[in-house]
A protein has these predicted regions:
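A short helix/loop element that forms part of the nucleotide-sugar donor recognition site in Leloir-type
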Residues: 3-19, 73
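Conserved donor-binding/catalytic core segment of Leloir-type glycosyltransferases
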Residues: 20-36, 42-45
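Nucleotide-activated donor-binding/catalytic signature segment of Leloir-type glycosyltransferases, i.e.
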Residues: 70-89
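Short alpha-helical donor nucleotide-sugar binding micro-motif in glycosyltransferases
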Residues: 88-89, 96-101
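Aromatic "clamp/platform" in nucleotide-sugar-dependent glycosyltransferases that forms part
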Residues: 109
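Short hydrophobic beta-strand element within catalytic cores of glycosyltransferases
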Residues: 126-129
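Conserved acidic donor-binding segment of nucleotide-sugar-dependent glycosyltransferases
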Residues: 141-142, 146-153, 161-167
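A short, well-ordered alpha-helix in the C-terminal region of glycosyltransferases
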Residues: 154, 161, 168-182, 189-195
């Protein structure tokens, strides 16, 4: 929850990761693999860096050998100072990493159900995701976030649109928090289950 975050700790983390130099942070949490759309995200970021030098990407998760990213993408992640890759992060700290993000991006090709999107929405982050199985049910389009295709140019354009409009980001973020509260909090899910069996 956003209200649980200690701002002093958040600022310390921001400085430690080198994100204090940037005014806009694109966030991702999950495995750093092809299936999650990381190739498209890094390619989109290359496009965005030509427009602005105050944007960063925060990748929270592990590089994996299964479904591994191509070497040129890995090298870009490892050498671009505006791409921060954290590796594994303890669950108890994850909300602080969401707290550093301005938007959350999941350009995935397939998901069971993207809990990372729900976590990000509960932290009042606007979402950019695809219409892949699972992802399609995780947002309300143009209310809590935006859908994109598996295309770096379209992804860059959508991120730039949100970067330029703080009011829309704020609106989507607040609506996303309500969407999660009303549909995915534990007591709501238990009520739905009870209705099925009573």
């Amino acid at each position: 929850m956003k209200e649980n975050i200690n701002n002093v700790q958040l600022n310390i983390l921001k400085r430690r990761l080198g994100l204090d130099k940037y005014s806009f942070v694109i966030g991702f949490t999950g495995r750093l693999v092809r299936d999650k759309g990381i190739i498209e995200l890094i390619q989109a970021f290359d496009i965005l860096q030509k427009k602005s030098n105050d944007i960063a990407v925060l990748l929270v998760g592990m590089l994996e050998t299964r479904d591994a990213l191509p070497q040129n993408i890995v090298e870009n992640i490892e050498t671009n100072p505006a791409i921060v890759s954290t590796g594994y992060v303890e669950n108890s700290m994850i909300e602080y990493y969401y707290g550093l993000m301005d938007i959350f991006v999941l350009p995935s090709y397939r998901e069971g159900f993207p809990t990372s999107v729900l976590e990000a929405s509960s932290m009042e982050l606007p979402i950019v995701t695809t219409k892949a199985t699972g992802c399609i049910d995780s947002i309300v389009e143009k209310e809590t976030g935006l859908f994109v295709g598996h295309n770096a140019g379209e992804l860059a354009e959508t991120i730039w649109l949100l970067r330029q409009d703080g009011d829309i980001r704020n609106k989507y973020g607040k609506a996303g928090r309500e969407f999660v509260k009303n549909n995915f909090e534990q007591h709501v899910i238990w009520q739905e289950i009870e209705m099925l069996y009573v």
